[in-house]
């Protein structure tokens, strides 16, 4: 999973016994280190989160506390504060600036996930993935270059709408042509992949389709209400474009389901 993010697909695959070895990769080092700490040292990260969460003051001062933790993280780049920021930011809509700084604001309506629940989730993930996972802080091309025909590469890169437009929400943007070149190389090597790339919000479509010569199967999957739309006070249904590499069996019926990550 070279654009790991929350590593939800890795966790899903491990939970359902779909693979016995995993690679979690991302260009944002603190995020990769957070995954590694969760999996390899679940007690350490759980204790740290509980300490940071419990130190929150009540009322309006909680906002200042969040901003203080965010400032400390942006200076230290530590996984403990990063976990708190992810779970405490508005609508869990995680945003990083181009320089790697955490840039999202605090959610004023809640205090973040309770430490007991986080501890339970962290230990469950550790049990699934400990001893089975490699961690790689590198570009997606580097992470995926060792994949073979016996592997499955799942990619959820920044969408064209957040790379080419004015709305830059991610630490590292992605050049579409570089992605297509890598997909062609993977197709030539017989490496199967699933790509979540662009889609549409309501009636508005984002991004161009992949080139026809890739012979990838495209389907639209309903993933629920748009987080960005919710932040803007609008209810907009989001559909993601999912591409299956040539050779992967497409479902008989295109799935229509909703899911939530962390």
Feature locations, PLM:
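Mobile active-site "lid"/loop adjacent to the S-adenosyl-L-methionine
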Residues: 97-98, 102-111, 158-178
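Adenosine-cofactor binding site in Rossmann-like domains, unifying the SAM/SAH pocket
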Residues: 27, 128-140, 174
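Long, positively charged, glycine-interspersed low-complexity recognition regions
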Residues: 173-262
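Class I S-adenosyl-L-methionine-dependent methyltransferase module
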Residues: 15-130, 247
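Short, conserved active-site loop motifs that form the nucleotide-linked donor/cofactor pocket
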Residues: 132-133, 151, 216
């Amino acid at each position: 999973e070279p654009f790991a993010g929350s590593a939800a697909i890795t966790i899903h695959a491990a939970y359902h016994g779909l693979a016995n070895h995993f690679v979690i990769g991302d260009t944002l080092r603190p995020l990769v280190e957070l995954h590694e700490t969760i999996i390899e040292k679940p007690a350490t990260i759980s204790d740290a989160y509980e300490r940071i969460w419990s130190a929150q003051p009540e009322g309006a001062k909680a906002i200042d506390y969040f901003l203080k933790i965010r400032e400390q993280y942006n200076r230290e780049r530590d996984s403990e504060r990063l976990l708190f920021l992810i779970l405490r930011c508005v609508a869990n809509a995680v945003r990083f600036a181009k320089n790697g700084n955490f840039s999202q604001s605090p959610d004023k309506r809640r205090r973040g996930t309770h430490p007991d629940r986080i501890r339970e989730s962290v230990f469950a993930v550790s049990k699934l993935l400990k001893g089975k996972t490699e961690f790689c802080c590198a570009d997606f091309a580097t992470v995926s270059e060792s994949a073979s025909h016996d592997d499955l590469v799942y990619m959820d890169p920044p969408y064209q709408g957040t790379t080419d437009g004015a709305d830059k929400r991610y630490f590292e943007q992605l050049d579409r042509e570089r992605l297509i070149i890598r997909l062609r190389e993977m197709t030539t090597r017989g490496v199967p992949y699933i790509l979540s790339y662009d889609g549409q919000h309501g009636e508005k479509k984002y991004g161009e389709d992949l080139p026809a010569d890739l012979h990838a199967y495209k389907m639209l999957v309903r993933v629920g209400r748009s987080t960005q739309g919710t932040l803007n006070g609008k209810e907009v249904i989001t559909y993601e474009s999912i591409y299956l590499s040539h050779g992967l069996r497409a479902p008989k019926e295109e799935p229509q389901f909703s899911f939530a990550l962390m």
